Amino acid sequence: MRTLNTSTMDGTGLVVERDFSFRILTACFLSLLILSTLLGNTLVCAAVIRFRHLRSKVTNFFVISLAVSDLLVAVLVMPWKAVAEIAGFWPFGSFCNIWVAFDIMCSTASILNLCVISVDRYWAISSPFRYERKMTPKAAFILISVAWTLSVLISFIPVQLSWHKAKPTSPSDGNVTSLGKTTHNCDSSLSRTYAISSSLISFYIPVAIMIVTYTRIYRIAQKQIRRISALERAAVHAKNCQTTAGNGNPAECSQPESSFKMSFKRETKVLKTLSVIMGVFVCCWLPFFILNCMVPFCGSGETKPFCIDSITFDVFVWFGWANSSLNPIIYAFNADFRKAFSTLLGCYRLCPTSTNAIETVSINNNGAVVFSSHHEPRGSISKDCNLVYLIPHAVGSSEDLKKEEAGGIASPLEKLSPALSVILDYDTDVSLEKIQPITQNGQHPT
């Protein structure tokens, strides 16, 4: 280092020193990214292995599969590329082809698992009773197997048979990619056919499915929230009327205005949740797959259309892999997993949770509105049943909604079973985990 510092006057030493500093910063950043990906997904897997109740929910099967694919990205893909980035060349020789296959397989599996989760959540709230009957552990394993099988088929077979490589246009291009890298950097030119077809399967088709499913989820959730809000207004209205009647002044009986604001707040929370899910995924992967389809069309003339700098390409490659570090936060950070993480990390007693005031509005067999309130730790789940924030009873299936719109909207009270209770937790965020199917008696299946 001293020699470098004393030789900066000629310019060469300054370049070397800057390059060394850049490599150190790159190493630190990539190490943190890899460690965070390992920690987050390892915690998800360990929590599922340690706690049986996490394995009892079919939805968590897809979260586990997602965590496994992201964990493989952190083990089989990211470290090797990080070493190559720091060293400036690929030091692992013939392991290159296997690494490329692992890269395509793990990344595709992660994206397909995200797509399966979106379909699972849409089915759960659009047809809750059919979902309860059809979405068995066997059905979940079949969907997961399809996602992983497809990931293997578009990765190992084409790579090992060299179907993914573009044919060199000249003898000098035999070991050079469209990004201007030699085989020492373990980068090979993709053929146009493979680049487009693999991008369609790995990203464009799944992202289209996710956009459709999450858009429909929001529309269903919006209708549910508005109907729940109507129920709340009717319940509070009845309570106010009972109170004023007891005071001898039954004329003053008004509708609460705050219920409209709460309905808007809940709709906003659902929209924010779904926006984060789609926004993070698209921001991480879309730039890479756009470039992935552009690079094979890189021209050889003076203008060289669709050609990009290798550093730019690598940056967006890491952007895509960074999605694996964010998935545990987005998909496995509900109350069940948070409590499991706290127990595994030994901070359950050191991090006491705050309490929320929970108001329960229920309707007994006589049709009377009954109010009760209690306190529960923030993020806790009732032992009797899971909290229902988006009630499939109030929405029904998509077919029921169409019939109802044609024949007139029934009163929200008529949509409720006598034993159904609506849990109102105004401080709790809306997440996909809270969109759950329920049975005929208004309870979650055990």
UniProtKB/Swiss-Prot annotation:
Positions annotated with a glycan in the UniProt record: N5
Database matches in SMART domains: 7TM_GPCR_Srsx
Sequence ranges on the Cytoplasmic membrane side: 50-60, 120-138, 219-272, 338-446
GO terms, molecular function: dopamine neurotransmitter receptor activity, coupled via Gs; G protein-coupled receptor activity
Disulfide linkage: C96-C186
Organism superkingdom: Eukaryota
Key word Cell membrane present: yes
Residue ranges of the TM segments: 24-49, 61-87, 97-119, 139-163, 193-218, 273-299, 313-337
GO BP, sorted A to Z: adenylate cyclase-activating adrenergic receptor signaling pathway; G protein-coupled dopamine receptor signaling pathway; positive regulation of MAPK cascade; vasodilation
Lipid-modified sites (S-palmitoyl cysteine): C347, C351
Function: Dopamine receptor whose activity is mediated by G proteins which activate adenylyl cyclase.
Subunit (UniProt): Interacts with DNAJC14 via its C-terminus. Interacts with DRD2. Interacts with DORIP1.
Name the record gives this protein: D(1A) dopamine receptor
